[in-house]
Amino acid sequence: MKNHKSLAILIPMLFAGSTAVNAIEIFNKNGNKLELYGSINPNHNFSNEFLSTKISSKEDNTNAILGLSGKIKITDKLSSYAQIEYKNNFFMPEDLMNKQQPNTVRLGYAGLKYGNLGSIDYGRNYGVIHDAQSLTDHVPYINKKSIFAYNDNYMVGRNHSLLTYRNNNVFGLVDGISFALQYQDEIKNRDLNKGKSSSGWGASLKYESDSGLTAVGSCFTSERMISSNKKDLKNTSVDSYGLGFKYDANNVYVAAFYGSARNLMPYNMHISDSFINETQNIEAIAEYSFDSGFHPSLSYLDSKGQNSNSPKKELDLAKQINISTRYEFNKNVSTYMNYKINLLKENDFISQNQIPTDNTIGAGVVYQF
């Protein structure tokens, strides 16, 4: 793979995260609420070799996201809630889209909440590691290749069959401290290697202060069932923990995340039961918000892995610097530019797993609701 520079023109006309901060309120009466949020993201990439004006490749990743979140008041303290988030890709011919159904349900869960006793829900949701890792996801248009952002990989990113209990302020007794407990039941085809995984448990603890400081710690453990012809393999459990910190006050946003995992990511996507023994992930971001509406930021990502089956003891999974800025016209409309400097160097592992080594320039206009 040649080291080349990629120009990505990203123009999301409607953007909103799953938190639905600027969601459209469809219904709100007597404590019952229904909100709609969504995005449509035209995304086209232009790639060319370094210092060359000739375009070597083009790629269309246009997609749309639509979500609904609702709440129903049952009693003064008891309420039910649900959320579903749906994604569709629009870069395939219509005939193929009808046959292959390139659609994705990103989120889909429902639950109950009772006063200070907390909430409990079940379905497709975020794993507890996301509680800590999300602190460095402050700039949504940066596409980080973090191993702790992969979906359908145990309790990392989004996954299904998650039973989640959350409690804010420790039953109303301690302000600023919240915790979560999570259980994932056994199911086939859960992880990236299309294997079978047994049940697992996870937890997270969060502290927030009035001064803008936040600290989050998350962890999970799960047993992986390997194939019958590999029963002699050791360390079949999948374990991970993450620590996240942020400061958000006085126009300054600074956050960092450290994550460590064992047997989490496949070393070779084409070989069953081949996993990186240990992975470490470091992320950091700093942003300053000017009163005029400009928000320049600088972020860093470094993911490394260790595998006894690899000729190299330490493998670079991702390494990048992002230099970004955005300008907010108002709470709904903003424009941005991002330059990603990819620090990865070509080797057998990167070629084998088709990990990109190109630099990327992204620019776009965002309208969010």
From Swiss-Prot:
The keyword Ion transport applies. It is a multi-pass membrane protein. Its main location: membrane. InterPro entries: Gram-neg_bact_OMP (IPR050298), Gram_neg_porin_domain (IPR033900), Porin_dom_sf (IPR023614), Porin_gammaproteobac (IPR001897), Porin_Gram-ve (IPR001702). It is found in: Cell outer membrane. The keyword Membrane applies. GO terms for biological process: monoatomic ion transmembrane transport. Residues 1-23 form the signal peptide. Gene3D superfamilies: Porin. One of its GO terms (molecular function) is porin activity. It comes from the Bacteria. GO terms for cellular component: cell outer membrane; pore complex. Keywords: Cell outer membrane, Ion transport, Membrane, Porin, Signal, Transmembrane, Transmembrane beta strand, Transport. Forms pores that allow passive diffusion of small molecules across the membrane. Homotrimer. Belongs to the Gram-negative porin family. This is Porin-like protein BUsg_347.
